[in-house]
Amino acid sequence: CIRDRACIANGMALHGGVIPACGTFFVFSDYMKPAVRLAALMHLHVIYIWTHDSFRVGEDGPTHQPVEHEAQIRLMEHLKNHRGERSMLVLRPADGEETVTAWKLAIEEHRPVALILSRQNIKNLPALNHSRREEAAQLSKGAYIVVDAAKPAVVMLASGSEVATLVEGAELLSKEGIAVRIVSVPSEGLFRDQPKSYQQTVLPQGVVRYGLTSGLPVTLLGLVGENGMIHGLDHFGYSAPYKVLDEKFGYNGQTVYEEVKKLIGK
C-alpha cells in the first residue's frame, strides 16, 4: 500500500547505497505523512514524487483532488531538523524545464524532497533573456522572475501550472499598458534562504502583489501579504473535465486580468 512504500523508502535510505524515490497521487500523500515526518526528523534523503497536484484531476472528483495538501506539506519547510536546517524541500515546478532543475536538486540534496507535479500537459514558459532552460535553473533560488517590466504596477506570483495562467493574464493586461512582473515560486523555503537583497529584488516593497494557487489561499499568504490578493480554493472540488473546472473556478487569463485591474484600481 502507499503507506508501506514510504516506510520502505526510509529503510532503504537508512541502509544507504541508493536514493529511494516513491510516488503516488498528491491527494494520497496523506497516507505517507508519518513516514515523511520521520524522514524529515532523521535527515533521510528520500524523494517523493506526487502527481495529479490539483483539482485538474477532473472526473475522478473531489476524493482525488488535492486542495489543502500543498499548504500542509509546505509547513515542513518551516520546521527545522536538529541540524538547524529546513527539514524538507518542497518543489512545485511550473514547466518541463523547471522540472529538470527540480530533479537535479532532488538528487543532490541530503534531506527529503517533495516534487509536486501536474497531471495535465503544460507548455514551457516563455524565455525572458536567455534560453528557457538557463532561466529555469533559477528554480534553485526558490523564486525568480519569469516575466518582467521596468516599473511593474503589480507583481504576480504562482507555482506549478498556475504560472502559465498568469502569463495569459499578463498578455491581456499588457494590451492596456499595465506593466506586470510574474514570479515563479516553486519553493518558498528556498526563497527565504536567499540573501535579503535578492528577495527584495524579486519582490520589491511598495508594489502590490497578486497570487494564484490551485490550493488554499494561505499557501501564498506569506509571500503576497495581507495587502495583496490571492485567488485560491477554499472548498472541495467537483467531478468534471479539468478545463470545465478551470472556467468554473476562475483559473484563466481573463479572471487574472479582471482581478488584477480591480486590485490596482484600473
Task: Cite the ranges covered by each PLM segment.
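Generic detector of short, aliphatic-rich beta-strand segments that form the cores of beta-sheets
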Residues: 1-2, 256
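TRNA-recognition modules of translation machinery and tRNA-sensing kinases, especially anticodon-binding
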Residues: 94
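Thiamine diphosphate
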Residues: 3-77, 79-85, 89, 98-101, 157, 167, ...
